[in-house]
Structures are given as C-alpha cells and as structure tokens.
Amino acid sequence: MEAARTAVLRVKRKRSAEPAEALVLACKRLRSDAVESAAQKTSEGLERAAENNVFHLVATVCSQEEPVQPLLREVLRPSRDSQQRVRRNLRASAREVRQEGRYRVLSSRRSLGTTSSGQESEYTPGNPEAAGNSGFQLLDLVHEEGEPEAASAGSCKTSDPDVILCNSVELIRERLTVSEDGPGVRRQEEQKHDDYVYDIYYLETATPGWIENILSVQPYSQEWELVNDDQEPEDIYDDEDDENSENNWRNEYPEEESSDGDEDSRGSADYNSLSEEERGSSRQRMWSKYPLDVQKEFGYDSPHDLDSD
C-alpha cells in the first residue's frame, strides 16, 4: 500500500489582505478504470465525482525562496494535542474567514525531500526510485481580489502609473527615457515584491497519489462542519427553559370541573333566549312555585302548618 503524502499550497497574496485560515481545494476523484461513466459527464455527476481537500494554514513567509520543509517538519511532528489545536484554531477563526477573493493555480511540482546540498529535489517521471520515496507536492497559487476584469485593470494601473486618461481614452505623450534599468526601476520592483507575502497551507493526504485535475480553490467558510451544533435531548436541562413562555409545560394547568357553574350558565343562557312574554310567564310560575319550595325545605306538609307557625 502506498504511503500517504503531504500536499502543500503556497499562496501569494498582498500584505494588506487577510489570510484564510483554511482553503478547500476541489479536484476530480481518482478512478481505477480509465473509462468514465456517463453519469460523471453531467453536472451532478461531476459534483459527486469531485473530492474536497481542506488545507490548513501553517505559516506566512516573506519570500518565495524560503524552504518549506522545515515548516512541515514542525507541523507534522507527532503531538498528542496537534489535532485538537488545529480544530480549536479553525473553530475560533471560522467566523472571520473572508468570503470574497479567488485563487488561481500558477504551478505544481512534487518535492521528494532535501538533498545533501540542502536543496529540494523534484520528481521526474523517469526516476522510479525517487518516485517511491515519500515526499510532498507543492502547488503555487495567487490570491486575486475582486473580479478578473477589475484585477486586470488594477494590474495595468500599477504597472504604468504615468498613464493619462481623457474620457476613458489613453493619451499618448512623448518623453525622453534615459535608462530603463536605473535605480528607480529596481526600487519599484523591490517595493512591488515587498507588498506580497506567501501563505503556506498543508494537507496530509490519507489516500495515495498526487492531487491532479484541480477544479476550484476557495476559503473554508462552512462553520457548521467545524462546530458540531447537534445537541442530544438529554443535554437539555430545565434551567434553559423559559418559565414565562406560553408553551412551557409548567404553565399548563388542568381545567377545574364545576357542575354547578355549568348549570347556572345553561340556565342564564336559556333565560336570555326567551321573549318578553315568555319571561313574564316564567316569573309568575317561579313566584307561585316559591312557597312550595319553602315548604319542602323546612319540612311542612301543608300551607296551614306554615300559617300556624
């Protein structure tokens, strides 16, 4: 089984721009057979066939000539809390990852380690012994801010700051050029190089082989993949409930059963539904029935007993 290799991204960006804490590199998934299926020819098939690789930020260097291997050895050194440190840093900086910006691949080469002279050796297809060694793949990228048209226009302005425009038309003027390679030109080139820095990202690939057929590179902004927001039901405590909420189970009281109240309400409803004549006759019946009710309540057999008392 082929050993896992480390892939490295070296991103050139302006010093004033903010670096992304992680980059997602999408490339075509490697297939064992040479013939592609018909499903992969569609857009949905290409999305399923794409493989996303997350590269983590290692360090930022000032020059492209600085070696990458010492930084990788420092990061890939066995440590018990290395994975926790990376996840903690990603979780802390996930909200600050910038959404804008594009990344364009400049070059890709494969380094197989450091030679005795201290220089990095590159992979050659005709060297099978070198191919068997465990090295890393280095990809150079450049961070382009804004749209391609704006970026190209900005590059033209920075390359020729003396251009004069009239109604968006470039004017032609004559000037005497003493020397194009004078100290002023070299100073501008040095200042231009000082305005850029290089961010080093790494990915310890778990699958054998090299990264090829790159589809896109974008900042890592999926915060829900870094932080697990799924909360189990047993993790919800009673202290977190809002007692003033109407939907709280504490505010649900059982309804008291009152038969007398129901009968009184039914009687008043029936009385209100009667007309004036019916109400008058009902009052007479109630008044004539009142002595009989009193006799029954006090235990008298006849009205004479009530008069004798």
Swiss-Prot record:
Protein name: Probable RNA polymerase II nuclear localization protein SLC7A6OS
Bias kind Low complexity: ranges: 106-118
Keyword Chaperone applies: no
Signal peptide extent: none
Misc. comment: When transfected to S.cerevisiae cells, able to partially restore polymerase II mislocalization and cellular shape in IWR1 mutant cells.
Main location: cytoplasm
GO cellular component: cytoplasm; nucleus
A Pfam family it matches: Iwr1
GO biological process, one term: hematopoietic progenitor cell differentiation
Residue list for modification Phosphoserine: 302, 308
Disease: Epilepsy, progressive myoclonic 12: A form of progressive myoclonic epilepsy, a clinically and genetically heterogeneous group of disorders defined by the combination of action and reflex myoclonus, other types of epileptic seizures, and progressive neurodegeneration and neurocognitive impairment. EPM12 is an autosomal recessive form characterized by onset of tonic-clonic seizures and/or myoclonus in the second decade of life. Affected individuals develop cerebellar ataxia associated with progressive cerebral and cerebellar atrophy on brain imaging.
Stated family: Belongs to the IWR1/SLC7A6OS family.
Regions of compositional bias (Acidic residues) in chain numbering: 233-245, 254-263
Stated role: Directs RNA polymerase II nuclear import.
Keywords for the protein's UniProt record, in alphabetical order: Cytoplasm, Disease variant, Epilepsy, Neurodegeneration, Nucleus, Phosphoprotein, Protein transport, Transport
UniProt-annotated location(s): Cytoplasm; Nucleus
PANTHER family: RNA POLYMERASE II NUCLEAR LOCALIZATION PROTEIN SLC7A6OS-RELATED (PTHR31196:SF2)
Transmembrane segments: none
Region (Disordered): 101-134, 233-287
InterPro entries, sorted: SLC7A6OS, TF_Iwr1_dom
